[in-house]
Amino acid sequence: MFKTHKIEIEWAGRPLTLETGKIARQADGAVIATYGETIVLATVVSAKSPKPDQDFFPLTVNYQEKSYAVGRIPGGYLKRESRPSENETLISRLIDRPIRPLFADGYKNDTQVIVSVIQHDLENNPDILAMIASSAALTLSGVPFMGPIAGARVGYCNGQYILNPHIDEMSESKLDLVVAGTENAVLMVESEAQELPEDIMLGAVMFGHKGLQPILDAIIKLAEVAAKDPRDFVPEDLSDLETAMLEMAEKDIRKAYTITDKQERYAALDALKTEIINKFMPETEEDCKFSVDQIATVFKQLQAKIVRSNILDTKKRIDGRDLSTVRPIQSEVGILPRTHGSALFTRGETQAIVVATLGTGEDEQYIDSLTGMYKETFLLHYNFPPFSVGETGRLGSPGRREIGHGKLAWRAIHPMLPSKESFPYTIRAVSEITESNGSSSMATVCGTSLALMDAGVPLARPVAGIAMGLIKEGERFAVLSDILGDEDHLGDMDFKVAGTANGITALQMDIKIDGITEEIMKIALEQAKGGRIHILNEMAKALTSARAELSEFSPRIEVMNIAVDKIRDVIGTGGKVIREIVEQTGAKINIEDDGTIRIASADAKTIEAAKRWIHSIVDEPEVGVIYQGTVVKTAEFGAFVNFFGSRDGLVHISQLTTERVTKTTDVVKEGDKVWVKLMGFDERGKVRLSMKIVDQKTGKEIIGEDSIKAEQEKYTEETHKSENKRRRKKKEE
């Protein structure tokens, strides 16, 4: 019934298998990939023809994690998987980025790649396996995909690179790097690092590229026996149109690209484009040789050729800069004084307002992943409104690009954050891109670093980021620092590097062509380092380190620790006690399983009141210490005083005052506030208190130290006499 094909190899000490022909047979391509005991299903379907007037390649990649893969039922009311999580969105982008450049130019058929994690062993991360399975399914599908590609994860521990470390090994690694590529070229890199130098990062990229070669061989072997016939696809030949347009418009295109202002340049190019379309479009549709989309496509190609050749020939760029110069930078902090921290970072025509907010344990984000539930204390959100590029557009939930850019900035900042023990706040940074002409994600990194320091977050060191580009034609190439949006679109590489003066914390690279050598990447990294140091120096003009004090509008958090067996006492039955503390004091209280308690409030007195309350629950009263209490009951032999949380003690009638007392209520009544000293405990553990040796106005002791022992002995004797008298009277009755 099934005609299956299977390839199995040993990779990084674990078995990896690729199988096709049994599941999802109606898809154009389908592969079951297994690594260890993690299993993913990847499918590819591409439409047989493009939609009318389609002027772009509509590729969609959907990565989804099924809860049943780890034997769990989804939470929530519906009890089923719903909208993609942030992690699923990021992995969808991770798969998309290396495969998109490998589709044939001009291919515009609707194409969808769906990857599902159907089993997870909690040891082998499914993201790399999903990338491999997607590449294999595309290679088998017959669509014009110039692959295969493969991916690998690289860790770095004790001076050694690790290929595909287990999930639990990553906690010890100073590097989390994902690399994807073909046999001869690196296409994509994504990483977070602990301030590693450029040579270590480059070595990791090359180590990973070498490590993924066996996967490429396995996919090719599978394709030799299972691939479908290639689809008939012949790219449009628009060479005649290109020649004619070049003769007509080359001079005007070059002139437009001498305009350094983005908006003015775009206006000139739009006017030129309209003029060209009008010249090539006859009055009647029957006489049309080319469509508007074809004319627009060739116009864009001509722009790329002219800009690229001009950069290679003159070493000058669109805005007049040389290859390594960074645009002018202006940094400001504290621009929103009532927020906890804020910064405005402007680099050329790219600008970000970043605002930092400090919260408590209640503000931590609960993240439900296949590996389990965990709490995130650092949140970074990136917003890219349409007005930032002078356009109109929708507003709403963040798109994939916004999520991806935010995560890149998160990776850049995260290694420099203080530990939760030394800075027990939940931190949220929001980057509002107000202008954009290239490298807005790196502006977010710079702005976030400044805003956090303005908020008093003690970063280990400031962090800056820079986006690099590449123009390559044959053996000639130019590496560009701090690229513009046009240089990103028309170039061959988008290479973002973020870090401190000591090393790299995040790196993201997308390469659109083959032939990027190790030497070119080395030059790009060194040039990026110079740019990063320059940006850090410019940022230092605004702020060099975290402010010594938090904003007056920030919450204060104090940490205390209690014994684990006392947690239930603080929480109380059904949370009764903790709710009462919160309601009465106004403080926010977070209790962790190890007995760590975080108390938060903008008011120091509120925090102190909550601390005293908790201490009164978990601490034991100390003999010889004076406490303030409340009379809760009176009797003929004395008064009961609540003096330590829920703890009550007896002040014997002889200890109410230095004068002789015949009736307790002559001295105190229920509800009175009194000062008492803890004298000790009787043989039954009952508390013995005294009022007469404490000044009731000041709460200070009024009997000298030499008399304390005698007073305690007298107290014990009188208490025994009173107790014996009470028992005799009760017996007589």
From Swiss-Prot:
Q: Which cofactor does it need?
A: Mg(2+)
Q: Where is the composition biased (Basic residues)?
A: 723-733
Q: Which Pfam families match?
A: KH_1 (PF00013), PNPase (PF03726), RNase_PH (PF01138), RNase_PH_C (PF03725), S1 (PF00575)
Q: Which reaction does it catalyse?
A: RNA(n+1) + phosphate = RNA(n) + a ribonucleoside 5'-diphosphate
From the UniProt entry, list the residue stretches annotated as the region Disordered: 711-733
Matching entries from InterPro entries are given as: ExoRNase_PH_dom1, ExoRNase_PH_dom2, ExoRNase_PH_dom2_sf, KH_dom, KH_dom_type_1, KH_dom_type_1_sf, NA-bd_OB-fold, PNPase
Domain (KH) ranges: 555-614
- UniProt name for this protein: Polyribonucleotide nucleotidyltransferase
**Gene name linked to the record:** pnp
